[in-house]
Amino acid sequence: MAGVMKLACMVLACMIVAGPITANALMSCGTVNGNLAGCIAYLTRGAPLTQGCCNGVTNLKNMASTTPDRQQACRCLQSAAKAVGPGLNTARAAGLPSACKVNIPYKISASTNCNTVR
């Protein structure tokens, strides 16, 4: 389990350093993952859901205000989930918006077609 946490932290650190967002650029995966960093323990170790995690989910929803940004956020979430691998609790990931009382227009799942997100 420690190996999964190290991998998850390394992936998040790399994505956070990925670079700033420019005015017309899509939301970066660093931004997406940075907002959800507080959710790692909840999603991988079954820790209790924290307000910090839910604040990140809310921030992410508010930042993804355009269709291209929502599609990019979807792709970033899928990439991060693949990087974490089998240590990710997919049911908790799918239920994260609901648990945080945040409505997002797509399901957090590896099977989500991000191109159809509006």
From Swiss-Prot:
* Disulfide bond entries: C29-C76, C39-C53, C54-C100, C74-C114
Q: Entry's Pfam families?
A: Tryp_alpha_amyl
Any one GO MF annotation of this record: lipid binding
| Entry-linked PROSITE patterns | PLANT_LTP
Spell out the CDD domains in the cross-references: nsLTP1
In the UniProt record, the signal sequence range is 1-25
Give the matching SUPFAM superfamilies.
Bifunctional inhibitor/lipid-transfer protein/seed storage 2S albumin
Q: Which GO terms describe its biological process?
A: cuticle development; phospholipid transfer to membrane; plant epidermal cell differentiation; regulation of cutin biosynthetic process; response to water deprivation
InterPro entries of this UniProt entry?
Bifun_inhib/LTP/seed_sf, Bifunc_inhib/LTP/seed_store, Plant_nsLTP
Q: Which UniProt keywords apply?
A: Disulfide bond, Lipid-binding, Signal, Transport
Is Metal-binding one of the keywords?
no
Q: Which family does it belong to?
A: Belongs to the plant LTP family.
Q: What does this protein do?
A: Plant non-specific lipid-transfer proteins transfer phospholipids as well as galactolipids across membranes. May play a role in wax or cutin deposition in the cell walls of expanding epidermal cells and certain secretory tissues.
Q: What is this protein called?
A: Non-specific lipid-transfer protein 2
Organism encoding this protein: Arabidopsis thaliana (Mouse-ear cress)
